[in-house]
Amino acid sequence: MLYPIEFDVIVVGGGHAGTEAALAAARMGCQTLLLTHNIETLGQMSCNPSIGGIGKGHLVKEVDALGGAMAIATDEGGIQFRILNSSKGPAVRATRAQADRVLYKAAIRHRLENQPNLMLFQQAVEDLVVEGDRVIGAVTQVGVQFRARAVVLTAGTFLDGKIHVGLNNYTGGRAGDPAAVSLSARLKELKLPQGRLKTGTPPRIDGRSIDFSVLEEQPGDLDPVPVFSFMGRADMHPRQVPCWVTHTNERTHDIIRAGLDRSPMYTGVIEGVGPRYCPSIEDKIHRFASKDSHQIFLEPEGLATNEFYPNGVSTSLPFDVQLDLIHSMRGLENAHILRPGYAIEYDYFDPRGLKASLESKAISGLFFAGQINGTTGYEEAAAQGLLAGINAGLQVQGKDAWTPRRDQAYLGVLVDDLITRGVTEPYRMFTSRAEFRLSLREDNADMRLTEVGRTLGVVDDARWDAFNRKRDAVSRETERLKSTWVNPATLPLEDAEPVLGKGIEREYALADLLRRPNVTYETLVGMQGGKYALESPLAEDPLLAEQIREQVEIGIKYHGYIARQADEVERLGANENTRLPADFDYSQVRGLSIEVQQKLAKHKPETIGQASRISGITPAAVSLLLVHLKKGVLRGQVGPRASSEGEAA
């Protein structure tokens, strides 16, 4: 049956990538259909009940700055919030939240069901409709055919998924959900480059069987309580609860070692490569054999359940081994396992087969986002989904694609890494992956992206008004500190010494004093009984006031470093966005080695910047490309430059 309505965009999959993709396309005014095998699992947190972390929190803030749902849903469902690396520099500080699974999922579903231009339909997709080299629709398991001008595929771990517990295995997309076997077979017919990856999850524990009296309590941050969304407030949060800490020990490790002969990872049953930075407990014990203990965090799954997630013991060992290793840890001697841990193998597609827009190079109108591209994590998936949804919408509207630059967003770093370098293991975001991380902080994600999002059509009026209010307030406050002067007469020794450590000997602007290492915005404006405090209308909005204080202090204290980084971006970006024609014949470039020619022909980079980051492409090869392009421009054969990938169409 052909469904009577033709859509602009179809999104296949209702996880973190799919929900952001569908919401983004719909916000842009595209008639959008989200197809999911089960409406009840929209936005489900398949593994750990947390959002954010180092690098990941930055992505969540960027998704939020572009109007996405993940951050605000976390504020509505988060039951513990912490700022990681709070004692370090602003570039690496990151927000992390424990989320109530039920509340988070409800917040996502509420937004999906109330988003104009978005329809939901519960049916697994078994086929794509492809005419020539273009996708035109999708077919569900009961034969309903939906037509669309663009399709976003966000199948997560479901493509030919296989679940492993010990040497037993069965097909599944995750525990309790079927694998997408037919869709996987159909995609194989399209001859897209693909491989197998693996991830895993720990057993879940009944909190009633945990002895909390012998465990270390880990509370969240309380003063102030962090929020994730730029539109969020602490009073949105439900009741806050602690996490708990235990440790593995030598007995735990002996139990694991004794069970390795029945581990699917160590007997060759699992072929897929697992995530390096979220290894299974058996992998930890094997790789770090000299370490006699590993920290394990017991994380609550929600306020209305006794279920706990033991973060750090992801495993695919047989259930009897899982039971013994859990019981070997302090506080868990009598723990009851509610759900066994397992590993899952699944198909992924080589992201080097994608354009920077996340559209397939082989099939027009087909976009890929999330774990299907070889990434791991909710946050990486959500960011890709948002971008794929935006670019699907732009294509439908006849506009140029948009992708943020590496110096503009962690999302830009993520996509550029994927499409130029590919993956050999599940890709996880870290702040260390970004060259320009001092400029890519959590606190300024809105300053970097919200204006672009407004141009793209994904930022609504409420967010736009709030952003402008904040931007204007930060600018005014920065100028106030630069133009407010003090001298020994107006700031006597008894007032200066507690804040500055000594008196001042001449006239200074407040901004100059703020640059001193031990001076904070709060202590500076609190001098002389708050004489220099923030103007009262802003101070009465605690969230806005805190955002202003943070932005102003970072902007003034790190001005020199940020300016130098901006100069570096400009210098390096001179040729970053120089376009390479899609039909470029690299064999015609004099001086390029056969190896380099083959790599460039295989990867088909869209820009000089992308070409430079392909493994094995040397600076000398890039120079030869630039010389060849320049000659072509002089002969009128190629265009010199395209508009910046980092600017909205």
From Swiss-Prot:
Its main location: cytoplasm. Keywords: Cytoplasm, FAD, Flavoprotein, NAD, tRNA processing. One of its GO terms (cellular component) is cytosol. Its cofactor is FAD. Pfam families: GIDA, GIDA_C_1st, SAM_GIDA_C. SUPFAM superfamilies: FAD/NAD(P)-binding domain. FAD binds at residues 13-18. GO terms for biological process: tRNA methylation; tRNA wobble uridine modification. The keyword Cytoplasm applies. One of its GO terms (molecular function) is flavin adenine dinucleotide binding. InterPro entries: FAD/NAD-bd_sf, GIDA_C_N, MnmG, MnmG-rel, MnmG-rel_CS, MnmG_C, MnmG_C_subdom, MnmG_C_subdom_sf. The keyword Metal-binding does not apply. NAD(+) binds at residues 274-288. It is found in: Cytoplasm. PROSITE patterns: GIDA_1, GIDA_2. Belongs to the MnmG family. Homodimer. Heterotetramer of two MnmE and two MnmG subunits. NAD-binding protein involved in the addition of a carboxymethylaminomethyl (cmnm) group at the wobble position (U34) of certain tRNAs, forming tRNA-cmnm(5)s(2)U34. PANTHER family: GLUCOSE INHIBITED DIVISION PROTEIN A (PTHR11806), PROTEIN MTO1 HOMOLOG, MITOCHONDRIAL (PTHR11806:SF0). This is tRNA uridine 5-carboxymethylaminomethyl modification enzyme MnmG. It comes from Ralstonia pickettii (strain 12J).
